[in-house]
Amino acid sequence: MNLKFGWNRRSFLAAVGAISGGLFAPSGLNATGTFGKKSKSSMPPVDGSPIVPITTGLGSTGDIYAELGITPLVNINGTLTVIGGSVMKPEVMELIRRGNQHCVSIDELEIAAGKFIAKLCKSPAGYTGLVTGGAAAAMVVGYAGMMTEDLAPRMRDIPDVSGFPRNEVIIQKSHRYPFDHQIRQTGAKLIEVETREEMIAAINPKTVAIHFTNILSDKGKVSGPETVAIAKAHNIYTFNDAAADVPPKERLWEYPAIGFDMVTFSGGKDIRGPQASGVLIGKEELIHYSLLNMSPQEDRIGRCCKVGKETIFGLLKALELFVNEDFDAELSKYDARAQIITDAVKKFGVTPLPRVFDPQALGNVTPRYSWHIDPAKLNITGPEVIQKLADTRPIGIGSMGAGASGMRGRNPDAAAVDDHGGHHGPPRNPNSFGFALWQLKEGEDKLIADRLVEIFNAVLKA
């Protein structure tokens, strides 16, 4: 399909609809919600054809983004919270729909979900899971549970932990990061250390746990297994924040197997569950304490970390799909997307660079694709290309600030690029541009390719 970039919102949505067809219908359903031409199933699709036609008010035009005056994005940055995380698969959307059909005891559902997670993720004996409102929420309720146990007065008092017998958390100085705010949110006091000897010396009767920031493990002097060994020797807990650290999927069971008492993973990143979801895997007793500190319980620090029944079902399906996914096959799909772009831009002297992919990286383990611009043929820099993609309308291609200072929410008007190549990127070569492709929907690689052709043609005509 040849998609022309006389960009307007109606033509774009029509094009995407033509590309995707029944993409958003549940697995096995076509865009009309039936299996093939005939089916006894009356189950409607989640998206594609609407469950309920909307003829008035919000949604009646078919373009909810335009109705609110906002710009949707083609995601070439990755699973960043600032742009909404990942794109859920149709099967996940279908479980969300089914999860909304009945009311249920949330505590009962969480306990059942925990058993499902533990089995799926090959958790050690005595471990279970918990669906949380994100990995940050998992840290809040996890640390709260460590300190309160099942004592109601403590659960009501937290974050005033001044009278708690144990309220200190040891953390390596190199492991300090924005998300340790969630530990401090519980009232716990962080004790910084640098070496193994300092870690051992810092342990005292007030120490409840040692925090381990997985993505920063190469920055510290005490490894994960060493941290676990020290904690076990002194009868204190360990918590591993591995929010963005799958794939590889094996980490879902490898980290608990090391002996961490609690490990959290984001549900809304590469697992591709609901954006406001997380997975907490830990010892059954600690997970029980964590659930006591979160919604649906009242007068608890985690009441604001509410997780709905729909989110729980969606996360479980996303996790199941992720664990059973053939990552090599997925990687081949990403390569094919990159080739579509390469084929479109090669006539401008723009050539592909080697794919950057380290499957054993500590976090954000996803391939990045880049292309080199011959400055003798095109008078445009790589950062300028990325900015022009972000400036595309009616739908932006890129984060428009997620990779720059807007990532931390300090400056939402920041440029789409910075001197370091965006989120977790190396210093940018002015004659190259690159991005991630794993969050693209079907057909969006062609949209990007056509937009790049338009950009480079405009440069030649200038």
Which stretches of residues belong to each language-model region?
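N-terminal export signals
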Residues: 1-36
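Short glycine-centered, acidic/aromatic-flanked micro-motifs in structured strand/loop junctions
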Residues: 98-100, 214, 373, 437
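Structural motif of enzymes handling amino- and sulfur-group chemistry
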Residues: 93-95, 303-369
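Conserved PLP-enzyme active-site core in the AAT-like
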Residues: 13-16, 39-74, 78-83, 87, ...
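Metallocofactor- and cofactor-centric catalytic cores in central/energy metabolism, strongly enriched
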Residues: 79-87, 93-94, 98-116
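Conserved C-terminal alpha-helix-loop-beta "cap" of PLP-dependent enzymes
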Residues: 346-459
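Short strand->helix junction
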Residues: 103, 217, 245, 441-442
